[in-house]
UniProtKB/Swiss-Prot annotation:
Its EC number(s): 4.2.1.20
Function: The beta subunit is responsible for the synthesis of L-tryptophan from indole and L-serine.
Keyword check for GTP-binding: no
PANTHER family, per database record: TRYPTOPHAN SYNTHASE, TRYPTOPHAN SYNTHASE-RELATED
Cofactor (UniProt): pyridoxal 5'-phosphate
InterPro entries: Trp_synth_b_CS (IPR006653), Trp_synth_beta (IPR006654), Trp_synth_beta/beta-like (IPR023026), TrpB-like_PALP (IPR001926), TrpB-like_PALP_sf (IPR036052)
Protein name: Tryptophan synthase beta chain
Highest taxon above the source species: Bacteria
Keywords noted in UniProt: Amino-acid biosynthesis, Aromatic amino acid biosynthesis, Lyase, Pyridoxal phosphate, Tryptophan biosynthesis
An example molecular function term from Gene Ontology annotations: tryptophan synthase activity
Organism per entry: Pseudomonas putida (strain ATCC 47054 / DSM 6125 / CFBP 8728 / NCIMB 11950 / KT2440)
Amino acid sequence: MTQSQYRPGPDANGLFGSFGGRYVAETLMPLVLDLAREYEAAKADPKFLEELAYFQRDYIGRPNPLYFAERLTEHCGGAKIFFKREELNHTGAHKVNNCIGQVLLAKRMGKKRLIAETGAGMHGVATATVAARFGLPCVIYMGATDIERQQANVFRMKLLGAEIVPVTAGTGTLKDAMNEALRDWVTNVEDTFYLIGTVAGPHPYPAMVRDFQSIIGKETRAQLQEKEGRLPDSLVACVGGGSNAMGLFHEFLEEPSVQIIGVEAGGHGVHTDKHAASLNGGVPGVLHGNRTYLLQDQDGQITDAHSISAGLDYPGIGPEHAYLHEVKRVEYVSITDDEALDAFHATCRLEGIIPALESSHALAEAIKRAPKLPKDHLMVVCLSGRGDKDMQTVMNHMAAQEKQA
């Protein structure tokens, strides 16, 4: 496997090796083919790229900083840890990088209505935000379980003018919300644009979302070059569907000196049935229009994912991650709920930054690795979102711990 083979994908059929593709209903096939054509044309259009750059700068607030986490570094006593500060974006997470790109594409295609799925609510908020900015009606599908644990984001979406449809099917989480959004799309193909929030779904979504998120890695390369005069030694990011990770990783896939680590949600532990680690605990199968690693039982039924973090609570993973796992370019590990919570508290106390519980999984892995590494090792952690949305979850967890004590 030569280095140049890590970054070419996907092929014309949307495949990364044997992963990805377009497994969709016949009614949707013309739509995804049309979307792929439109996206290729937009990518080659200087006017589209200029408009995208304008919104990235003046609306999202990019570039965001690459911040040296000095006290966390001292605390760990090893590698020099940097945070890529995606939580400082408008709307508080990396999700908006992708939403602004897709809404510009929807506008270019003459679509009049946006739909999206959301888990933690951050993609829903980002979609509702861009819908408001461009004056488009917007329907967000959200699992009833997630609505319960993400009240603040639900209210934000409503304030921004979005309609929220609670999904009670299945476990009432992200997978079920995505199923409902796909059903809506099939019924409203003419005027509706489905704004998928992660590097999953049928081609061209995994590649398109990755491309809109790849600004994370491009900025990181330039910023670290300026600060340290060289490439990072390692990159760490959390992986649910995997868009913040793909955004950071893609720029460095062909740099053999850069070690890349994706962190899955280990829940109560990958040895239990309460986790969301598709690569460490799943097998290949087809879900939501693409072939990838999935959590499923012996009959091929999708099993429930569990994570303390709503944004990682998905039983699959983006197909490009599945490919990078198989060719061993990226190392995928898992972090438990408890380890993520410890890292969450440490980052609050040491750096004065309240990270999202999703990002806390990446921070936990960084805290684990850093002490074993030399002091000149440069480690970049993607701080994918801020933790405001997780206050209730953390409060509940702390209250439960106090009761046990």
